[in-house]
Amino acid sequence: MFILASQSPRRRELLSMLGLTFEIITADIDETMDPALSVEDAVAQVCKKKAQAVGASHPDQLIVAADTIVVVDGRVLGKPHTETEAKEMLRSLSGRSHTVMTAFCLSRGDRFETHVEHTHLRFRELSDAEINAYVATGSPMDKAGAYGIQDQAAIFVEALDGDYYNVMGLPLCALTKCLRRWGINVLNG
């Protein structure tokens, strides 16, 4: 049993798929990334702040927090705030390669373990009609980079190198290795 410090329905689905038991308590923090840090360090810092915020009121519980971003040409794409911003993000990814980074942090009390997973993707060229139709579904609005690989945006992905589940918001292979070190074994392996 642990606490998932995330409101992401995809993270909840992925952990449930593994048969893990957890409670959800969301962290209310400022998710602004520190521009003085590298992108990888900044996303890890945001993730650690989520774990610390929830852990402050649950010091004896194992906390799992995560944060996902998309990086294209050194530019960080978080969740779009408007449909116009979602369309701009998708245009910036069209026909290009990008990296999805998900940081996760396990914590209990003063002990922390943080990991950042990278998955590299390439989108095919997207037409304005496809972008408009996809944004009209509403799906992009709660996702970093304005797309969900597990939904209709799957048809945009021309190539993928790395953990597919990382793109959904939680790199399951890396996470379960860490969970094992914290005493939680999936499939009792």
What are these regions (language model features)?
Residues E23-E31:
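A short beta-strand-loop structural module common to alpha/beta enzyme folds
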Residues Q7, A27, G109:
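Cofactor-binding loop segments of dinucleotide-utilizing enzymes, especially the Rossmann-like FAD-
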Residues F2-I3, L37-G189:
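Anionic-ligand binding patches
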Residues L20-T21, G148:
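A generic short alpha-helical patch detector that favors 3-5-residue windows
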Residues R11, D30, A51:
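Generic structural marker for isolated residues within well-ordered, non-membrane alpha-helices
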Residues M1-L20:
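N-terminal beta1-alpha1 ligand-phosphate binding loop
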